[in-house]
């Protein structure tokens, strides 16, 4: 299928990969046999997916037609179809930021509607839907914290972010950092940043600032701004080494040949690397000793030692993009 913006989740035993293609295709791949186990074209345009807490359900977020479809992980048979209908005219919204959450939940955002929805799939035959409206303009991506408690949507249509505490749903959506960027001249946005790879280190979170050459630091106890770090370009992914000691950042064009490393104690940039043109994605080994980088424009995957920052290996690959290790099978939201 179309893998231009594809993503992958894994079964609990790490044997099967579920690939979400931009063409609406959902493909189940047997990694041991090296073959496709099942495939379905479930929409015209999809933008990612998630696997349920128990590993029995796979959900896909769709742009066209807007909504979420949920499938049996074994057979890829349709279990639930949730159209993202909003307003009084029956319009359908693009869906983004789909993640799994504890309790057999899927959480996602509606770009056009400015809403966050939660679907409880504890009883797959009777999905329970809960909607939170008026969260802000154009949520463009979202994340769930590693403990599965907070769902946070970045807003493209206005400054700030929308946060939902999944432990206390009755409190509703809270706006955090509402004044961020006020009075500042915004730059053209060359590549939408991704919040999935935001970095958590102790009580601090590091997130890319939309349209700015900055990484935003958030105090997770108060959900207030704790600092801003000037970086080389517009950040796309801000990802923490598994121990949280360092944060690695890649950038949008024209600065996408560069990686910067931030020390999470001093908040200083301690290393700058230039792996090559078109660094699109980063993935750390589960214990953090290595990081793999896709260098699309030079048809390579680079492997760096995260302690010495030296390049350990380089592998040829045709236009590599996302890198997804099977260890993601055991992490919430991935």
Regions from the PLM with identified roles:
Residues 1-334:
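Predominantly soluble domains enriched in secretory-pathway, periplasmic, or organellar proteins
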């Amino acid at each position: 299928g179309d893998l231009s913006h594809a993503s992958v989740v894994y079964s609990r035993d790490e044997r099967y990969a579920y690939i979400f293609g931009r063409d609406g295709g959902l493909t189940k791949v047997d990694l041991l046999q090296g073959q496709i186990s099942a495939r379905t074209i479930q929409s015209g345009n999809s933008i990612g997916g998630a696997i349920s807490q128990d590993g029995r359900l796979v959900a896909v977020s769709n742009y066209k037609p807007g909504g979420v479809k949920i499938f049996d992980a074994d057979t890829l048979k349709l279990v639930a179809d949730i159209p993202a209908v909003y307003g009084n005219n029956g319009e359908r919204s693009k869906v983004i930021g789909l993640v799994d959450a504890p309790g057999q939940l899927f959480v996602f955002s509606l770009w056009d509607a400015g809403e966050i929805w939660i679907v409880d799939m504890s009883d797959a035959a009777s999905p329970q839907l809960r909607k939170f409206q008026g969260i802000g303009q154009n949520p463009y991506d979202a994340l769930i914290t590693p403990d599965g408690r907070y769902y946070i949507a970045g807003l493209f249509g206005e400054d700030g972010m929308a946060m939902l505490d999944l432990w206390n749903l009755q409190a509703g959506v809270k706006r955090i950092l509402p004044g961020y960027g006020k009075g500042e001249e915004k730059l053209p946005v060359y590549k939408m940043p991704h919040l999935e790879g935001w970095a958590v280190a102790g009580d601090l979170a590091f997130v890319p600032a939309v349209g700015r050459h900055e990484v935003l630091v958030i105090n997770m106890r108060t959900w207030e701004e704790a600092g801003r770090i000037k970086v080389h370009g517009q950040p796309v992914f801000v990802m923490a080494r598994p121990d949280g000691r360092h944060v690695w950042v890649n950038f949008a064009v024209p600065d996408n040949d560069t990686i910067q490393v931030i020390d999470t104690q001093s908040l200083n940039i301690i290393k700058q690397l230039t792996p090559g043109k078109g660094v699109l994605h980063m993935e750390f080994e589960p214990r953090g000793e290595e990081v793999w980088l896709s260098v699309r424009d030079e048809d390579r995957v680079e492997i760096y030692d995260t302690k010495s920052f030296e390049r350990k290996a380089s592998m040829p690959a045709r236009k590599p993009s996302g890198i997804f290790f099977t260890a993601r099978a055991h992490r919430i939201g991935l």
